[in-house]
Amino acid sequence: MRIALGVEYDGARFHGWQRQNEVISVQQHLEEALTRIANEPIRVVCAGRTDAGVHATGQVVHFETTSQRPDRAWTLGINTYLPDTISVRWVKAVPEDFHARFSATARRYRYIIYNNTLRSGILANGVTHIYGDLDHELMHEAAQKLVGKHDFSSFRAVNCQAKTATRTMSHIRVKRMGDYIVIDVQANAFLHHMVRNITGTLVAIGHKEKPVEWVDELLEVKDRTKAGITALPNGLYLVHVTYPETFALPKLKMGPLFLADDF
């Protein structure tokens, strides 16, 4: 049978999602916990592989098993064997045609900036500290130029292995909440470092180092070296993955922290 999981994790202590030799990953911990509960080797497939330091409140995975357990037993059992920084939020049996990656129709990320002169001593791993006043309204205005179907070559990592840089962005919003600025973005799929590179570009605009029209130039030139720096990973969260309603997956609050779904 095929089972889907909703997973939340603090990425600060892991070398990314993907299992790797000699370093600790989220995938490794999850597969080891599942193997113990299922009493058979388990390998998982995720909706989106996150980099080292990147978090998730809405990661989705699936796996195959012959073990028969109620959903609640899976949830409680798996969490027993996971570290405190990883939590399974829901479990659901799914049809064989469900695929965590290929069935997904959209991914949604949120990037949290702590815009204050002094860094935070409490949320250091969960937000990115950027000092110097940021004009979030300029950032939002510039971000709207990214909505729609574009070639995002200027915002992909140099080592990105995607066959095409064309992606369709359904929305991107920039909103200030006191000392915090949140960038909320959704697209059908994302390139490697795409959200972090967009964030670095918007920060330069927010600092008024570049004009709003710079985004138009970057979309036209399709050159990663011309865009902003890659923002740090610690402010980035995968908060939701969208699937067809026919799969009827559970819907939980996206977060992270204090953020409402419709913030």
Swiss-Prot record:
InterPro entries (UniProt xref): PsdUridine_synth_cat_dom_sf, PsdUridine_synth_TruA, PsdUridine_synth_TruA_a/b_dom, PsdUridine_synth_TruA_C, TruA/RsuA/RluB/E/F_N
Listed Pfam families: PseudoU_synth_1
GO molecular function: RNA binding; tRNA pseudouridine(38-40) synthase activity
Swiss-Prot/TrEMBL keywords: Isomerase, tRNA processing
SUPFAM superfamilies reported in the protein's UniProt record: Pseudouridine synthase
Catalytic activity annotation: uridine(38/39/40) in tRNA = pseudouridine(38/39/40) in tRNA
GO biological process, one term: tRNA pseudouridine synthesis
Active-site residues, as the UniProt record annotates them: D51
Secreted found in the keyword field: no
Enzyme class, first EC level, given as a word: isomerase
Domain of life (superkingdom): Bacteria
EC numbers for this chain: 5.4.99.12
Residues bound to substrate: Y109
Annotated family: Belongs to the tRNA pseudouridine synthase TruA family.
Matching PANTHER family: PSEUDOURIDYLATE SYNTHASE, TRNA PSEUDOURIDINE SYNTHASE-LIKE 1
Function: Formation of pseudouridine at positions 38, 39 and 40 in the anticodon stem and loop of transfer RNAs.
Annotated NCBIfam families: hisT_truA (TIGR00071)
Binding partners and assembly: Homodimer.
Record's protein name: tRNA pseudouridine synthase A
